Amino acid sequence: MALDTPSSDLPVSTDDTAEHQPTPAHRPPSAADRRSVDLLEKIRRPRGFGAGAPKIAGTVVGVLAGIALLSSIFPLFRRLIHYPRDFIDNYIVSLPNTSLAWAFVLALVAIALSSRKRIAWWIATIYLVLFMVSNALLLVDPVATDFGVDTDERIQIWIGLGIDAAALIFLIVTYRQFYTRVRRGALFRALGVLIVGLTAATLVGWGLVWAWPGSLERTERLPYAFNRVVTFGSIDSRTFDGHHTHIVIDSALGLLGALALIAAATVLFRSQRLESLMTSDDEKLIRALITRFNDDDSLAYFSTRRDKAVVFSPDGRAAITYRVEIGVGLAGGDPIGDPESWPDAIAEFLTLCDRYGWHPAAMGSSARGAAAYDAAGFGSLSIGDEAILHTREYTISGPAMKAVRQAVTRTRRAGVTVRIRRHGEVPDDEMPQVIARADAWRDTDEERGFAMALSRLGDRADDDCLLVEAVEHAGTPEEKVIGMLSFVPWGRRGVSLDVMRRDRGSVNGVVETMVTELCRNSEQFGITEISLNFATFRAFFEQGPQIGAGPIMRLGYSVLMFGSRFFQMESLYKSNAKYLPDWQPRFLCFEDNRILPRVGLAAIVTEGFVQLPRFGRKQHYIAGQSSIPAGVDADALIAQLESEEDRTAVEVHRPEQVRVRVAKLDRLIEEGFDPYPPADAPTHTIAEAIAEPEGTQVTIAGRVTKMRDFGKVTFADVHDWSGQIQMLVEASRVIPGTPDFGSDVDLGDLVEARGVIGRSRSGELSVLIDAWRFNGKCLRPLPDKWSGLTDPEARVRQRYVDLAINPRSRELLATRSVVVKALRDFLADRGFMEVETPILQQIHGGANATPFQTHINAYNLDLYLRIAPELYLKRLCVGGVEKVFEIGRNFRNEGVDFSHNPEFTSLEAYAAHSDYLKMLDLTREMIQHAATAAHGEPVIIRVDDEGNEQRVDISGDWPVRTVHEVVSEGAGVEITSDTEVSELRGICDRLEIAYRPDWDAGQIVLELYEHLGEDRTTVPTFYTDFPTSTSPLTRAHRSKPGVAERWDLVAWGVELGTAYTELTDPVEQRKRLTAQSILAADGDPEAMELDEDFLTALEYAMPPTGGLGVGVDRVVMLITGQSIRESLAFPMVKPTDA
């Protein structure tokens, strides 16, 4: 039973001291990272004298705002606090008994003070000074006399002045803690709204006071309304001789003033946001950054959303787009642009947050982006997963996709088709209809989304976006669009879902059909990946209802299920999960756990789940001033980014020697020479030229492998496949207009030259050149000619270089060609027909081996690369082809060593009216024939321990031994086909040979054979009569029970081939393959699957047949004495970056 721990219940959670979830490749922290950490720490825990002053000031003013609000709303509360409130109102700070406007003002100031706004400090300081001056005047005659200030009131005024003075001193000494600014806004416009609003409210209030004057005189009514609406009741009541209206009217007057203030504040805040939004220049640069750097970011395009602000790194190569809600600067997704500049962009974002007193956060970051924020000191929380579909792997077949398959089938039967277009292909007169449908089908008043929504359907700047529509009765007068999906570009090969809508009255399954059709037609649009919706807290929905889920997981699941009644979180998860997507985690990054609730609320607001008052604010706009850093030329930077992208596609890092050769190449082209001309066939190979008498004119072509430049004359060794010869190039003999051979030719260059056969002064046979040209300029230097490629790994990886400089490698390649041709000719001369059978197969069979798997998109079908052609060749035998063979490639997903390669060449041959003994003679003679073709006699090459090559004669008959005979000899006891499993296990234990407990006697004998027979074999030897259980395609021995008519050919520990008397009994074959398929179903990757088509063919009767299979690569190894790496032109090698 699993223990429930927080780590197993929670998707991801961190605090300030815990390790964060994303773990990027560790790199030293950059200066920008250190700066970000310092800034974040400053935002979290302000330093310096009076660091807590803003919070204290904000709290005090906030308490006063709460008292003012409660006093304005609840009469009982107003009566309970009458005396202390009256003292505060008269002697410390204005606190009228009813004024919603003043409560609103105090609340704004409290929030601004706690956010360290300097303007709030000025407001509070100036207000205190003015309030103190007005109260101090009451201590001075004749004002004191006019207002009837007595001794008791003087004492209270002095007490109030003392409290205000202390507060003023507190604000002055903590001035530096109030350093944050406010964003630029339309101050005069907001002031105009305030003046108009307060004037209108005063006039309305005057009317109310006139209608219900209470004890007010006619001349007092307008000033009284002004006092309550505009000055929030700050004018001393004694001004009106204690006269007042009804308390309800007072509350109404305060409410009117509050409404005017709210309207003005809304205009100011709205203008602040508008002034900070990205401009068209910002968007242009962001698009260039996305194109250059964010190919792998599925949310990058949403950074062009125009109701976001943007901050760039100082070099302009990275940016963060964000929005401010409830004092949280919320970035959307990962930073945009060059990852090398991400730390600088994050530092600039934190600087901005620090300047304006925002709490920084980022929503929807990928693991890579969260790692960048992690390096800057942020915490992170996994908030869900993004659903990614890989179009080449997407299929609606299989039990897991039943629901989607049924939905698609239902929709197609209803006559629904799918239309897919780029937005740029939608006519201008049709796009408004698309937008209208999207608005009509939206189930909320406002468009939701922030990190994964663009919120501007139909903008011509987004012509690359993809529109998928479900259409009923397409092409008829009744044509009707009933569903739509809109996707934004995701790099070059993907799209991300932006809009999903459908007509609620349409048939169910419209969305599933659109998604499926997009995947099916993805290749037409160059799409390989589709990003669908975001599933919030997927781990809870996936694991919460499961048996064994812990209490925290279950509690979280219950809470989210309750929330899903309002926000459709569970339905969104299920709508994604049914496509079996690849889930990519997304993170919420934040400064501090203590601020997490506020960040969460800001995220909910930005996503549109909670609507704050907007007062007619438009949805789409670009305003404000550009955020591109001073000193950055945006047009020049965009041009640079575009050129970088072009260079990235073609340029690679080149060593110095290569750069020198490339420079020489450029110079030759500028001088009019073609280093890569069309073909002009030479008249002679080098071998033919060597055979010609002196004085013969020849034209040869080859690669320069050695040069000796003596100024006026240059000697160069040139070779082609046939041989090598010296070229003598004398400047005086070469026709004019030819490049300078000594300075322009490098080792490795391909040249073609004309001259006569002659000799140098030292007597060496040479071609005396009178004209030459380049056939190909070699841009990389060749290894040393004498030592060549000394690293065996390099010889394999750069086989082309090895062949160019190593005659032995060319000889081995030629020998392989001779051997393969000899094998083919040997069988053809004996009446065998060569055929070709499929390499892509639906069933893997013909041998016990692990196959490679692939997929065909056209049929949406999983396929295997063949492990053997046997079953198809046997079909031909059923069809009457009496002698047949194939030389071709097979593929087995197994190990790589000196004798194994995942892809290899095999020869399989079948002869009717034959058996395994006849195939034994045929195989021996065939290999002897191939050895004779390679070496002129039936010998093979063996390399001894000292590296010396020895020729071994393989003529005549080869040893033939039974498997049980060699196993008995090696074990020291007699082993037969009747030996019990327990006895065989005892022998293995004694010899320390490992075996599996579920093996039968035949499999244990086979394991003993591999250790005691095969591994110890030297000269070519046939081992016959294998246990029947290990040979499912082989006929049982005609006279020996328990064994099959099969042999293996082994030489020096390597199996070269095998042959059977083929099993032609369809009933017995079905039993054996059924047993193999059961093993495959139980998880044995090497067991054969049941090939029903082959069994059906066998039921048509196949003549008695002998079959053989020989590894061509291993025969080449045997004949040449080399490993499989040297025997193959291009063996499989591990990638250099693996």
UniProtKB/Swiss-Prot annotation:
Positions that bind Mg(2+) 2: 1055
Region (Phosphatidylglycerol lysyltransferase) location: 1-646
Cellular component aspect of the GO annotation: cytosol; plasma membrane
CDD domains in UniProt: LysRS_N
SUPFAM superfamilies: Class II aaRS and biotin synthetases, Nucleic acid-binding proteins
Comment on bound cofactor: Binds 3 Mg(2+) ions per subunit.
Cofactor: Mg(2+)
Highest rank taxon of the organism: Bacteria
Main subcellular location of this protein, as a coarse class: membrane
GO molecular function: ATP binding; DNA binding; lysine-tRNA ligase activity; magnesium ion binding; phosphatidylglycerol lysyltransferase activity; tRNA binding
Biased composition (Polar residues): 1-15
Catalytic activity: tRNA(Lys) + L-lysine + ATP = L-lysyl-tRNA(Lys) + AMP + diphosphate; L-lysyl-tRNA(Lys) + a 1,2-diacyl-sn-glycero-3-phospho-(1'-sn-glycerol) = a 1,2-diacyl-sn-glycero-3-phospho-1'-(3'-O-L-lysyl)-sn-glycerol + tRNA(Lys)
Coiled coil start-end: none
Subcellular locations according to the entry: Cell membrane
UniProt region (Lysine--tRNA ligase), positions on chain: 647-1138
EC number(s) per entry: 6.1.1.6, 2.3.2.3
Pfam families associated with the record: LPG_synthase_C, tRNA-synt_2, tRNA-synt_2_TM, tRNA_anti-codon
Bilayer topology annotation: Multi-pass membrane protein
GO aspect biological process, one term: response to antibiotic
Keyword terms of this UniProt record: Aminoacyl-tRNA synthetase, Antibiotic resistance, ATP-binding, Cell membrane, DNA-binding, Ligase, Lipid metabolism, Magnesium, Membrane, Metal-binding, Multifunctional enzyme, Nucleotide-binding, Transferase, Transmembrane, Transmembrane helix, Virulence
DNA-binding region listed in the record: 698-772
InterPro entries: Aa-tRNA-synt_II, aa-tRNA-synth_II, aa-tRNA-synth_II/BPL/LPL, LPG_synthase_C, Lys-tRNA-ligase_II, Lys-tRNA-ligase_II_N, Lys-tRNA-synth_II_C, NA-bd_OB-fold
Function: Catalyzes the production of L-lysyl-tRNA(Lys)transfer and the transfer of a lysyl group from L-lysyl-tRNA(Lys) to membrane-bound phosphatidylglycerol (PG), which produces lysylphosphatidylglycerol (LPG), one of the components of the bacterial membrane with a positive net charge. LPG synthesis contributes to the resistance to cationic antimicrobial peptides (CAMPs) and likely protects M.tuberculosis against the CAMPs produced by competiting microorganisms (bacteriocins).
Family, as annotated: In the N-terminal section; belongs to the LPG synthetase family. In the C-terminal section; belongs to the class-II aminoacyl-tRNA synthetase family.
Full protein name: Lysylphosphatidylglycerol biosynthesis bifunctional protein LysX
Source organism per UniProt: Gordonia bronchialis (strain ATCC 25592 / DSM 43247 / BCRC 13721 / JCM 3198 / KCTC 3076 / NBRC 16047 / NCTC 10667)
Lineage, top ranks: Bacteria, Bacillati, Actinomycetota, Actinomycetes, Mycobacteriales
Gene name of this polypeptide: lysX
